[in-house]
From Swiss-Prot:
Its main location: cytoplasm. Disulfide bonds: none annotated. It is found in: Cytoplasm. Homodimer. PANTHER family: D-AMINOACYL-TRNA DEACYLASE 1, D-TYROSYL-TRNA TYR DEACYLASE. Keywords: Cytoplasm, Hydrolase, RNA-binding, tRNA-binding. A motif (Gly-cisPro motif, important for rejection of L-amino acids) lies at residues 137-138. Its EC number is 3.1.1.96. It catalyses: glycyl-tRNA(Ala) + H2O = tRNA(Ala) + glycine + H(+); a D-aminoacyl-tRNA + H2O = a tRNA + a D-alpha-amino acid + H(+). An aminoacyl-tRNA editing enzyme that deacylates mischarged D-aminoacyl-tRNAs. Also deacylates mischarged glycyl-tRNA(Ala), protecting cells against glycine mischarging by AlaRS. Acts via tRNA-based rather than protein-based catalysis; rejects L-amino acids rather than detecting D-amino acids in the active site. By recycling D-aminoacyl-tRNA to D-amino acids and free tRNA molecules, this enzyme counteracts the toxicity associated with the formation of D-aminoacyl-tRNA entities in vivo and helps enforce protein L-homochirality. This is D-aminoacyl-tRNA deacylase.
Length: 145
């Protein structure tokens, strides 16, 4: 399971001209689910994402996680993160989880975030989405379990 996380001042996702999720300061999480992923990996990745200290403390050091910083989370499914790009000029998506399994793990990940009392917004699984964000820093990290 892969999360591309970005520290943002604001972010939103729109599907068919409808805003389905919107946050102020916090994390935009682009989530990719791979074939071998399961609930245990989703738990570990959620723990890492929410615990990752990429927000500045009073001294300006990256020392706070999203909850300590009072931020929110916007989770957007992105199967392209599971692509194999090592050969050729076209990505292969054979490493991605089957759609039903990927959706179940995506929804499980979102629910785990919500259980941590963090405002968690979402896109719509498998939809054509427009994501708008203001990356703060810029600060972007690739987390994989």
């Amino acid at each position: 399971m892969i999360a591309l996380i970005q520290r943002v001042t604001r972010a939103s996702v729109t599907v068919e001209d409808e805003v389905t999720g919107e946050i102020g300061p916090g994390l935009l999480v682009l989530l990719g689910v791979q074939k071998e992923d399961d609930e245990q990996k989703a738990n570990r990745l959620c723990e890492r994402v929410l615990g990752y200290r990429i927000f500045s403390d009073a001294d300006g050091k990256m020392n706070l996680n999203v909850q300590q910083a009072g931020g929110s989370v916007l989770v957007v499914s992105q199967f392209t993160l599971a692509a194999d790009t090592e050969r050729g000029m076209r990505p292969s998506f054979s490493g991605g989880a089957a759609p039903d399994r990927a959706q179940a793990l995506y929804e499980y990940f979102v629910e785990r975030c919500r259980q941590q009392a963090i405002n968690t917004q979402t896109g719509r699984f498998a939809a054509d989405m427009q994501v708008e964000l203001v990356n703060d820093g810029p600060v972007t990290f690739w987390l994989q379990v």
